Swiss-Prot record:
Residues 905-927 are annotated as: Disordered. It is found in: Virion. This is Long-tail fiber protein gp37. It holds the Pfam family Phage_fiber. The long-tail fibers are trimeric, with a stoichiometry of gp34/gp37/gp36/gp35 of 3:3:3:1. Keywords: Host-virus interaction, Late protein, Viral attachment to host adhesion receptor, Viral attachment to host cell, Viral tail fiber protein, Viral tail protein, Virion, Virus entry into host cell. GO terms for cellular component: virus tail, fiber.
Length: 1026
């Protein structure tokens, strides 16, 4: 056959070596035997790789009938179709996985492991996983686990189980609209977050029943019991034709015994009895009323033997403490015990008045249309804090008792309209109208005390009169005529000289009076004087004493007084009286002092005399109480201490002034008090602050309080607003010396009416100011709680600002930081860190720290400073840092051990083995070769002597001819050795075993706790809620 010529490659055995461009011609090949890589040189002089070891491009189909193993990534630009499964020991990654047959499978590694479908973040951390847990013989379970945020180590899991026909379990189930199911089994239903107007549950059935009077118009709402075998209670709603709609409660295994019900018109029915306010224990069995005392139909209140007890049709009793107090029948109220009507707040231990204008007992007597008051009869009526009784009606009240009627205390008042007359047991009769007797007054008693007596009058002049009324018929007096007696000896002030006065008068004035004067001088009995109002016609007048004419007196001739005129009782002169020729024109005097009317050229004076010179003494040397300017009309009092200038309407006071008690100074319209303060006029009190408490440093309006009251308010300025029924005042509280601006509205809650307001703005001596209500400056309000509102920034609402700051200030820990707490009792505003969720809307600041809404579970955890590359709040399981242990056993040379000696004797082999040997063959014909020979002029440099003589120069060299190919044949055989046997002498001998130095495997046993710990003290971790 033809022989292929060997292909020559440039070769290299060093890994990674590429041929240089200078060693290859275009198209020439080179190979790296280590990398199994082929190279060539292209027409541009570049070295390129051939083959797949370093990549390349295949334009066409490739069929691999075997295993394709990739040690790097596999990138598929187009689609990929496989006829069998795709397996990976690590993972398969792609943007989208789509099943065109509708299935994805996750196979567990064994029957005790989970099958997973994972969801990850971009960094490979877990978002969630769906996994199926190992099945049991009776059920299976698929769980959905969701990681609670990137910064959390906690998870939420949801369970789908095959038991009970299929179950779903989650911590919370939220339905944005409705959760529709036939049955829900829960421990507690919470409706705390429901919107206003929503119901906890609906059972608005739309049953339709045929016919009328149907028996199935029933909606069964609930049935409950407390224990196995306990009473079952049923809650039912019924709506049956011809009957009222009703909600009712029954008992029994089925609704057999109706307990009570409420109809749609509000009426309620109870099967047996009702007890109100009788609870004494948590689960009372004996607080439902005393059946023995109350019967079997009752309403008890407070205790079990007090309330209403049904007796028979139309009759029930009021029962107190087990005893019948009253019976109510269809036609009456019958008291079966002592009846007491009164008002008491402690069951009769003490009694109080009924409310104002209210009665203890009222009888509706207005049915006869009487017009007395409200027409009702009232017993125990509170009128002005006093107990009154009113009997009213258009009939009469009859009192028929054998011994008459006693009124005690003895006061009887008869009233008709606004008129009344009162009879008193002491004989007094008081009447609004005069007492009129239709017949005469006949005094039957015979002693000398019998007669008409008039009590002493209570007022001056005009009391205790005897009056004859006037008439219009013939013979009657025209005007009434009165006789009265009085006196003024006991008057407090004024004239007290008339001990008794007897006077006769009519409606136009007095006729005459006579009186006894009080004794004077050495008199022991006063003299009698009489006075007539008109003319006195007498044949003669004899007067032992003075004769005085009060009115005018007509005398036929002149009256000449030779020694002046002395008028003791006064004189009335209708004409002008002229007094001239003397400075002291007129004197008014008494035994001690006189007052002289004196004039000068320009003034008129009223000047007193010295003491005890009243009748004839000269004027006082210095006193000038009254001066009247004759040229200007000015009036000066007290040496012009007080001057009235009529022309200028000006009053000048040149001295201290005083208005005595109970008198006032009133300023009229547009009047005012002007305290002058100019550069030339320095008002009272002007000066330093330090001098203001000096008693001699006054003010234009000054009050010096020098009182020892324990407690009193002294106002210095007051303004009362009549229409507003309120008063403002400025003053001092004596008990503490504080100054107050005060407002009082209404009365004193007594005689002046109810109080409507009472506020005081108080200036404290220590500099504090007290306001009863809020302080307002512009739009800013300082309220009584200390809050400031209405301002800007933090002062829009200071409380809100402080509350916000207080949460941060109260603790040195930021909100969200774990705080070690040495107690199982958690302080208010904090929570244990147990992995629980929290309401982020209720605690927005905590939500900033934990945006997932889950507080980390710090039980058994320690806090570690976050290393680089680790997420905040990520959890790390416990573990031991990777380390190694060394262990060795000491080397021991156990020496050489000798086995026991035993003689095995001689052993023979079997007698087989005869055989021969044969062979044949030939050698190859190869062997043709040539030799190269050089000739020299001396000894050959190759060391081979070619000639026996010396060759002194190189003659040259050439090859011998190529010849010598030949072959050999051969064959051989051996004779048969025949069958034969051998014997072997073993003999007695021993064996030695060299143990030598050696090592042993060391097992290190486990020891220590279940987890890595350091010395520690257990604290609870708590976190602030905000």
């Amino acid at each position: 056959m033809a022989t292929l010529k060997q292909i020559q490659f440039k070769r290299s055995k060093i890994a990674g070596t590429r041929p240089a461009a200078s060693v290859l011609a275009e198209g020439e090949l080179a190979i790296n035997l280590k990398d199994r890589t082929i190279f060539t040189k292209d027409d541009s002089g570049n070295i390129i790789d051939l083959g797949f070891a370093k990549g390349g491009q295949v334009d066409g189909n490739v069929t691999i009938n075997g295993l394709l193993r990739l040690n790097g990534d596999y990138v598929q630009t187009g689609g990929m179709t496989v006829n069998g499964p795709i397996g990976s020991t690590d993972g398969v990654t792609g943007k989208i996985f789509r099943s065109t047959q509708g299935s994805f499978y996750a196979r567990a590694t064994n029957d005790t492991s989970n099958a997973h479908l994972w969801f990850e973040n971009a960094d490979g951390t877990e978002r969630g996983v769906i996994y199926a847990r190992p099945q049991t013989t009776t059920d299976g379970e698929i769980r959905l686990r969701v990681r609670q945020g990137t910064g959390s180590t906690a998870n939420s899991e949801f369970y789908f189980r095959s038991i009970n026909g299929g179950e779903f379990q989650a911590n919370r189930i939220l339905a944005s609209d409705s959760l529709v199911t036939k049955r829900i089994a829960v421990d507690t239903v919470i409706h705390d977050a429901k919107a206003f107007g929503q119901y906890d549950s609906h059972s608005l059935v739309n049953y339709v029943y045929p016919g009328t009077g149907e028996t199935n118009g029933v909606n069964y709402l609930r049935k409950v019991r407390a224990k196995s075998g306990g009473t079952i209670y049923h809650e039912i709603v019924t709506a049956q034709t011809g009957l009222a709609d009703e909600v009712s409660w029954w008992s029994g295994d089925t609704p057999v015994f109706k307990l009570y019900g409420i109809r749609d018109d509000g009426r309620m029915i109870i099967r047996n009895s009702l007890a109100l306010g009788t609870f004494t224990t948590n689960f009372p069995s004996s607080d439902y009323g005393n059946v023995g005392v109350m019967g079997d139909k009752y309403l008890v209140l407070g205790d079990t033997v007090t309330g209403l007890s049904y007796k028979k049709t139309g009759v029930f009793d009021l029962v107190g403490g087990g005893y019948s107090v009253a019976s109510i029948t269809p036609d009456s109220f019958r008291s079966t015990r002592k009846g007491i009507f009164g008002r008491s707040e402690d069951q009769g231990a003490t009694w109080i008045m009924p409310g104002t204008n209210a009665a203890l007992l009222s009888v509706q007597t207005q049915a006869d249309n009487n017009n007395a008051g409200d027409g009702q009869t009232h017993i125990g009526y509170n009128a002005g804090g006093k107990m009154n009784h009113y009997f009213r009606g258009t009939g009469q009240m009859n009192i028929n008792t054998q011994q008459g009627m006693e009124i005690n205390p003895g006061i009887l008042k008869l009233v008709t309209g606004s008129n009344n007359v009162q009879f008193y047991a002491d004989g007094t009769i008081s009447s609004i109208q005069p007492i009129k007797l239709d017949n005469e007054i006949f005094l039957t008693k015979s002693n000398n005390t019998a007669g008409l007596k008039f009590g002493a009058p209570s007022q001056v002049d005009g009391t205790r009169t005897i009056q004859w009324n006037g008439g219009t018929r013939e013979g009657q007096n025209k005007n009434y005529v009165i006789i009265k007696a009085w006196g003024n000896s006991f008057n407090a002030t004024g004239d007290r000289s008339r001990e008794t006065v007897f006077q006769v008068s009519d409606s136009q004035g007095y006729y005459f009076y006579a009186h006894r004067k009080a004794p004077t001088g050495d008199e022991t009995i006063g003299r009698i004087e009489a006075q007539f109002a008109g003319d006195v016609y007498a044949k003669g007048i004899i007067a032992n004493g003075n004769f005085r004419v009060v009115g005018s007196s007509a005398l036929a001739g002149n009256v000449t007084m030779s020694n002046g005129l002395f008028v003791q009782g006064g004189s009335s002169i209708t004409g002008q009286v002229k007094i001239g020729g003397t400075a002291n024109a007129l004197r008014i005097w008494n035994a001690e002092y006189g007052a002289i009317f004196r004039r000068s050229e320009s003034n008129f004076y009223i000047i007193p005399t010295n003491q005890n010179e009243g009748e004839s003494g000269d004027i006082h040397s210095s006193l000038r109480p009254v001066r009247i300017g004759l040229n200007d009309g000015m009036v000066g009092l007290g040496r012009d201490s007080f001057i009235v200038d009529q022309n200028n309407a000006l009053t000048t006071i040149n001295s201290n002034s005083r208005i005595n008690a109970n008198f006032r100074m009133q300023l009229g319209q547009s009047a005012y008090i002007d305290a002058e303060c100019t550069d030339a006029v320095r008002p009272a009190g002007a000066g330093s602050f330090a001098s203001q408490n000096n008693e001699d440093v006054r003010a234009p309006f000054y009050m010096n309080i020098d009182r020892t009251d324990a407690s009193a308010y002294v106002p210095i300025l007051k303004q009362r607003y009549v229409q507003g029924n309120g008063c403002y005042s400025l003053g001092t509280l004596i008990n503490n010396g504080n100054f107050r601006v005060h407002y009082h509205g209404g009365g004193d809650n007594g005689s002046t009416g109810p109080q409507t307001a009472d506020f005081g703005w108080e200036f404290i001596k220590n500099g504090d100011f007290i306001s009863p209500r809020d302080l307002i400056a512009g739009k800013v309000r300082f309220d009584r709680t200390g809050n400031i509102t209405g301002g800007s920034g933090n002062f829009a609402n200071l409380n809100s600002t402080i509350e916000s700051l207080k949460t941060d200030i109260m603790s040195s820990y930021p909100i969200g930081a774990p705080i070690p707490w040495p107690s199982d009792s958690v302080p208010a505003g904090f929570a244990l860190m147990e992995g629980q969720t929290f309401d982020k809307s209720a605690y927005p600041k905590l939500a900033v720290a934990y945006p997932s809404g889950v507080i980390p579970d710090m039980r058994g955890q320690t806090i570690k400073g976050k290393p680089s590359g680790r997420a905040v709040l990520s959890a790390e399981a416990d573990g031991v840092k990777a380390h190694s242990h060394s262990a060795s056993a000491s080397s021991t040379d156990l020496g050489t051990k000798t086995t026991s000696s035993f003689d095995y004797g001689t052993k023979g082999t079997n007698s087989t083995g005869g055989h021969t040997h044969s062979g044949s063959g030939s050698t190859s014909t190869n062997g043709e070769h040539s030799h190269y020979i050089e000739a020299w002029n001396g000894t050959g440099v190759g060391g081979n002597k070619m000639s026996s003589y010396a060759i002194s120069y190189r003659a040259g060299g050439s090859n011998t001819n190529a010849a010598g190919n030949h072959s050999h044949t051969f064959s051989f055989g051996t004779s048969s050795a025949g069958d034969h046997s051998h014997s072997v002498g073993i003999g007695a001998h021993t064996h030695t075993v060299a143990i030598g130095s050696h090592g042993h495997t060391i097992t290190v046993n486990s020891t220590g706790n279940t987890e890595n710990t350091v010395k520690n003290i257990a604290f609870n971790y708590i976190v602030r809620l905000a």
